[in-house]
Structure formats: C-alpha cells, structure tokens
Regions:
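Short, surface-exposed acidic-centric catalytic microdomains
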Residues: 30-58, 63-68
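Conserved small/polar residues in nucleotide/adenosyl-binding loops
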Residues: 128-131
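N-terminal Rossmann-like dinucleotide-binding module
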Residues: 1-43
Length: 131
C-alpha cells in the first residue's frame, strides 16, 4: 500500500479529486495517510476531516524563522512515513532538505506553465495580467 501525504494551502479541489479517485478505485493500492496545510481554516482541512484523513497545520506564522518552519514541516511529514508526497496547490517553497530526503517521491500539481508563470505574486490576479 502506497502511503501518500498531500500538502495544501487552500480549498483543496485537487485534494478532493485525489480522495475521490482513491475512494472509487481509480487510484489503487494507495492510502492517504495525512494532509498538511500551511494555513488554518482552509476548506482542504474540512475535506480531509470529512474523508477521515488525519490533517495538520504547519504554518510559517507559528515559527520564529524560515529554518524553524522548514524543520517543523519536515518533522510533520516524516511522522507519516510517506512513500509519496503530493503538493496539491501548496503555496510554499519547499526546503531543499525535503527535496533531498524525498527525491523522486514528490509530485507537484501546478496550475500554470513553469517557469513562465510561477513564483511570488503569480497566485491570483497577477496570473491574468501576465503576457
């Protein structure tokens, strides 16, 4: 059984698609073991709860600095012992240590062409005003 952690920042529509695909058997041999959000009170957390998936918030606002946040994020992920991490609308630059530790085990769902439309400011209206 593939153990999957999904990282989210907002509404969780991609998360819901994954939940539904696992539930209906489209995605097989997979267990969604955790959802991690960098924001409190987002709909993705409700979706996880409704599906019976453990969910945690690891917010940069709860840490003194970026290094402490990065370590908190990694510690939370490690606790789930994932085989795969899905970044489903996760609006955080992930730490290099995470990329190294989970090499070839991270999938990023990005709503636009990379690298043309990504980075700070491209979430929301800026995307629609770009060339």
């Amino acid at each position: 059984m593939l153990r999957v952690v999904v990282c989210v920042s907002g509404g969780g529509t991609n998360l819901q698609a994954i939940i539904d695909a696992v539930a209906d058997g489209t995605i097989t041999n997979t267990e969604l073991v955790g959802v991690i959000s960098n924001n409190y009170g987002v709909r993705a957390l409700e979706r996880a709860e409704k599906a019976g998936i453990d969910a945690k918030v690891v917010s940069p606002k709860d840490y003194e600095n970026r290094a402490a946040f990065n370590e908190g994020l990694l510690t939370t992920i490690r606790a789930y012992k994932p085989d795969l991490i899905v970044l489903a609308g996760f609006l955080v630059v992930i730490p290099e240590a995470m990329i190294e530790e989970y090499e070839n085990r991270i999938i990023n769902i990005h709503p636009s062409l990379i690298p043309s439309f990504c980075g700070t400011g491209y979430y929301g209206c800026l995307l629609y005003t770009s060339p």
